[in-house]
Amino acid sequence: MKDLFKIYSNYQPAGDQPTAIASLIDGLESGLAKQTLLGVTGSGKTFTIAHVIQAMKRPTLIMAPNKTLAAQLYGEFKAFFPDNAVEYFVSYYDYYQPEAYVPASDTFIEKDASINEHIEQMRLSATKALIERKDAIIVATVSAIYGLGDPDSYLRMLLHLSRGEQSDQRKILKRLAEMQYTRTNLSLERGQFRVHGDVIDIFPADSEKEAIRIELFDDEVDNIARFDPLTGEILQRLPRVTIFPKTHYVTPRERILETVEKVKVELQERLAELNAQNKLVEAQRLEQRTCFDIEMMLELGYCSGIENYSRYLSNREAGEAPPTLFDYLPPEALLIIDESHVTVPQIGGMYRGDRARKETLVNYGFRLPSALDNRPLRFEEFEERSPQTIYISATPGPYEQEHSDNVAEQVVRPTGLIDPEVEIRPVKTQVDDLMSEIRQVIAQGSRILVTTLTKRMAEDLTEYLSEHGIKVRYLHSDVDTVERMEIIRDLRLGEFDVLVGINLLREGLDMPEVALVAILDADKEGFLRSERSLIQTIGRAARNVKGRAILYADTITGSMQRALTETERRREKQKAFNLEHGITPKGINKSVEDILEGAYIGKRKTVVAEKSPQYTHWSPQELVKQINALEKQMYSHAQNMEFELAAKIRDEYLLLKEQLMKI
């Protein structure tokens, strides 16, 4: 237990970090259920939490409000704890259209989904780490409160093999089939097994690039080895191995049979209800759909939409909470909720939206009432299951403020950087004044963020600035995650100088190059101009030594006053600390790649950086062929969330298209 977690870093805690670390550790050791780390932008909150984890030596679940932030946190913790099981647990859907029915137009929408296999593998790897290891750190999104396979059923389906034990080949193959592995005679892929005589090759569903070889002799396990499925090279001989199921929803045969019987009973009860209400179409529809599912479960052990029968598969009572990732956590685990002012309300809002859609499906005979128990956790259920918790935010929400037993403040940054100076200027001349400021900041080699209230205003401002020779881009809600990452990358690289948007605070990403944040119409009260939003937006300039914020307003609203007072309080504390310790503020020097470090660090190690080929002497046919090849690569990387690689290929792709146009 002495060195269960070990941080690898060139830095030591500084600024307010040592005090915050000591305060949080003391709170955890005293048994406090909920604490808050109130840390300003750029104060090293992740580093503080890493030290808390190292000191407490407990498995940890870290929840972020979106995949982008989760990927960033995963990259940071992976760098801090290279020897530990840092895992990634987010929704594995690239695209998801839930099953739904619209009574007004009598339209039924079938469930349609595209699953990202690599993220599915990482989810399986995350639960495996929680089961097998004490040094697990899981970075997750709100996906953690959604139904997952029952841990008891999952554990009962594990396949344990040891060298020298008696084991019949047919039994092993049967168990692999029950675990939903598929047999192949071709190249081995994840979730498959292959048989050659007495040799069984298995590619575990939770493994990224290593497979297992089982060699049998006379119904005895003669040898177990890890090998590379691509080259066939033996990597390591093993005394024993545990193969985990292909999916979290795998269920023992006897539980499937029990489920089928319970579903039949519920079906008869529901049909009687519908017939009594003279809902004959709904009754016929329900009987047809449910009988088909029953047949599939009996034949294959699963069916499409099997999660709708999860109440019976996990042996729960009606209304009982579904098993989730929280059921895989050991009792001594820690829970860290990042950007809690966003994440906590998000957790609270998931249940109702899901419930409304499913009630329609039940009422119109598409699903049995038990399908309502395939749902995310209610907020009170989430609270019951949460272990000791630390909320992290620069602007904690009302829930954290009310329920936290201890607030550790982290206002002083290790770099000595001070919160941006805030100026208030009149609305009347805001556009002309802004343009003047933009030109000054660009001349210094820095970048600018501008936040507006409406989409229309953002578009008009972008067009106006562009007409006046300023390199500007517009970030809005229709931009998907990959493109959003590319836009932020391009801003940092200087491809353009000004980013205009409506809600630029939701990224939570590091942009040290931003020296000016301009907030237009700051005196219009509302969500986008609340105290919390203003503090978060002003904080976007806090990573730059010359960071400033300009609020364009004719009156000072209550939210503005509170935000200004809090910012000034922080500035005074930071200045006093710097003066007392003789610290000169230093800018953050962070490479552009750092922002994009996410869930694919392991993969990137195998990529060799090649010099861009010279295409000047290529024929149009060769260029077209290369453009098509690059386009496929670009979309493949983007689909796998490999943002950095996708962006690099995109740059080359655009160069080639430009060259082709000149021919």
Curated annotation (Swiss-Prot):
Residues 430-596 form the Helicase C-terminal domain. It comes from the Bacteria. This is UvrABC system protein B. The gene is uvrB. It comes from Legionella pneumophila subsp. pneumophila (strain Philadelphia 1 / ATCC 33152 / DSM 7513). A motif (Beta-hairpin) lies at residues 92-115. ATP binds at residues 39-46. Belongs to the UvrB family. Forms a heterotetramer with UvrA during the search for lesions. Interacts with UvrC in an incision complex. Transmembrane segments: none annotated.
